[in-house]
Amino acid sequence: MRIEQVIADRYCAAVLIDFTAPEGTILDQDYYAFDRSVSATSRDGVKMQTYGIGWEVLPSSTEDETGRHATILMTIHSLKGEFNFIGAKVKLTLDGLYRDNCLEELVVPGRWSCTFTLPETDPGRLCTVNEPIEIEGKNAVLTTLYVSPLSLTCEIKQGTDDLKETVEPIYSDDGKESIAPEVTLQNGETVGAADWLFLITNYADERGRYCFRMDEILDPETVSSVSAFGETFSVE
């Protein structure tokens, strides 16, 4: 196993893994996952408390006649607190390659560990909005938008309606319809969301953070506006 590349933005990190199975093992599925342990400490000394993981098998950039090779993208995000991945130190331990996220079908046994420091420069743009929005008739406030090559993140806080009731539609449709994030580039092109990375609501703090992977890798400097929750907001 080899770590090919590690990139991060404020809210998540992406680890590109090049994996070659032992002779006799064919990696021909469209999904694999590792059992794992992740610890991270921000450059301010804050430890990541809880985290979520995503896995995606990517098309290989090289020919592999043996069928033993897989390129796997691992994404890591914090589930609690204000953890910032920029410049964070990460220790990653992977235990066995599995065919499923429940870790029931072991494909390749083994243990692999590494420690790395994420890039110090924030590749994204954080834009303060503080504008009212509606989610199926319920009021909230869109506080910030964050655009990076990795993701588009919307943060909201409670408005005049109870936050728990307000965000119910987000979880019923995975944010696809109730948030419907889309960016417009300076050349007029629009880019939609491929999938959500995480949907987190902190009811104690009356805030929510909803992060999406877009259909294309974005250059934040070329984004002119973001559409979300049925409204369009300039980020220039």
Regions inferred by a protein language model and the residue ranges of each:
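Alpha-helical, hydrophobic structural elements that either
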Residues: 1-236
